[in-house]
Amino acid sequence: MMGIGCWVHYWGDASEQEKSLLAKALVKHDIETAPLDQDRPSGPGICIFDEITGRLRDFLQFVSCAGRQRIIAIAKLEALRNGERGWELLQAGASDVLVWSDLDHVVRQVKARLERWISIEQLLAGACAAGVVAESPVWLATLRRISEIARFSDTSVLILGETGTGKEVAARLIHQLDSRPNKRELVVLDCSAIVSELSGSEFFGHERGAFTGALSERPGAFALANGGTLFLDEVGELPLPLQAQLLRVIQERSYKRVGGSTWHRTEFRLVCATNRNLLEMVTRGEFRADLFHRIASFICKLPPLRERIEDIIPLAEHFFSSS
């Protein structure tokens, strides 16, 4: 199929009139359709249903290849009267759940999602060609969310995950896919490795003579990341005084160098990562609640490798070939 294409499948009863109306609406919006090959299902696809059952959930899991393929589940109005919830279908493998009310409106929604998904899959294909390993459904789903937030938003991102889950890989992918014009560099700062006495200089930079050993002026992370992305790894290790200073820069987008009196403007995308539970730290008074809400506009939890069994052999081959 050329252009935007998908398969369409009716789960349950559907009149010929309903099928004809949907087919005409899809053609009107330049969406090509094909029958579902149930022997070798591939996405994207549309499944229209009138009742949520265990068999429907099993079907969605099968045709989505356990989440690998993009499926839109469209609920006819009678399906909603049962009090069922769409999240059951999302858990089963559907990428989105829509409601069949106004047909033209729902088809416009379908087209918008298909166009966005095509863009995201192209971005992911480029990332995988550049060395990102993604075979497991759970990791593919995570990378899709990362790609979508990176390309279609400039919001701050908080990456959560155990050590070794690929937090820096995710941060670099966000920076790589960021669509800002004239985007500059990715600046990486490991908060756990910053010497407390020099933390101000690391973030804000310093003027010549600001302290013993400051023989020349030096730009800090806020200056270097201007126009680009600032990645704060292990952000949970920041001491409270520095948290307050970071919060102010995020809010005001301006700072002073250590030993300086001039305000400097900075604009950057903020990506933070940690293996700690920041909400528990907030409860204990170890992490500022206002800073947490600033850095966590979008939260991405990375699955550990034990939940990505399909990626183990490809990862081993990748590391072997690059060694």
State each model region's role:
Residues 1-126, 306:
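N-terminal accessory segments that target, anchor, or regulate ATP-driven/P-loop NTPase machines
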Residues 65-72, 154, 182-184, 267:
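His-Asp phosphorelay/catalytic-motif detector in bacterial-type signaling
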Residues 71, 157, 186, 229, ...:
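Hydrophobic/aliphatic anchor position in the core parallel beta-sheet
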Residues 113, 117, 206, 210, ...:
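Conserved AAA+ ATPase "sensor/coupling" helix adjacent to the nucleotide-binding pocket
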Residues 125, 129, 135-138, 151, ...:
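Nucleotide-binding/hydrolysis machinery
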Residues 145-213, 223-239, 304-309:
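Conserved post-Walker A coupling segment in P-loop NTPases
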Residues 196-201, 219-253, 268-272, 278-290, ...:
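Conserved AAA+/SF3 P-loop NTPase catalytic/coupling segment centered on the Walker-B
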